[in-house]
């Protein structure tokens, strides 16, 4: 297990440990989580992204709904613990179906399990990729004058996204944290929604003539594509 995954797991396990300690002390367990409202969204100048502010809401076992939320969170953390220990991964969809074996803790619909993963991201300050949760959709492709280093199952490899790829380009992996930008000669990045337009630009040598990095979004961009573009 990598160092960041160990830190992630340690942070995750603090949640059920806190619930247990509260119950041990005879208290009704609860957890705090950032409130998901427009009023609680702030722009982080350093990272240049929108983040949640300091406003908190409480998930408590005082209500039946709150008790179910804490129970499901404990089951999900147990599942993520096993997944990290075994170096396995799963999709959001798979997590929903796996919960069918959790008895009263199972999710009634996938949006419930999706929101819980989002809750864990907010509480722990780790991304779902660190939990080994991956999206269903494929990443987009990149063509252009940029050299990257990617961590693969067989070690690291360096790829130039013009010289070392075919017309299909370099496919963005699910976890873009495994990519390091080494150098580039690009003047700008252009994101293209449709495959036809992207292919036309490649055929006409647009990336070489204008030193452009062409990113094919494949319609609505996947999470990994959005994260890569932000970098």
Residue ranges and their predicted role:
Residues 1-231:
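Nucleic-acid enzyme cleavage-core boundary/entry regions
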């Amino acid at each position: 297990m990598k160092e960041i995954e160990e830190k992630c797991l340690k942070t995750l396990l603090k949640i059920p440990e806190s619930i247990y300690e509260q119950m041990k002390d005879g208290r009704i367990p609860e957890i705090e989580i950032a409130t998901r409202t427009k009023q609680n969204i702030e722009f982080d100048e350093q990272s240049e992204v929108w983040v949640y502010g300091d406003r908190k809401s409480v998930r408590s076992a005082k209500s039946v709904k709150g008790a179910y939320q804490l129970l499901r969170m404990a089951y999900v953390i147990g599942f993520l613990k096993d997944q990290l220990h075994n170096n396995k991964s799963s999709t959001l969809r798979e997590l929903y179906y796996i919960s069918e074996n959790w008895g009263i803790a199972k999710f009634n619909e996938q949006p419930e399990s999706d929101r819980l993963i989002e809750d864990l991201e907010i509480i722990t300050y780790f991304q779902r990729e660190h939990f080994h949760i991956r999206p269903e959709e494929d990443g987009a492709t990149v063509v252009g004058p940029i050299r990257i280093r990617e961590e693969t199952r067989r070690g690291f490899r360096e790829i130039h996204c013009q010289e070392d790829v075919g017309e299909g380009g370099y496919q963005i992996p699910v976890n873009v944290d495994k990519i390091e930008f080494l150098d580039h000669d690009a003047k700008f990045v252009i994101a293209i929604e449709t495959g036809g337009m992207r292919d036309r630009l490649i055929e006409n040598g647009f990336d070489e003539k204008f030193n452009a990095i062409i990113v094919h979004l494949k319609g609505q961009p996947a999470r990994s594509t959005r994260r890569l573009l932000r970098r």
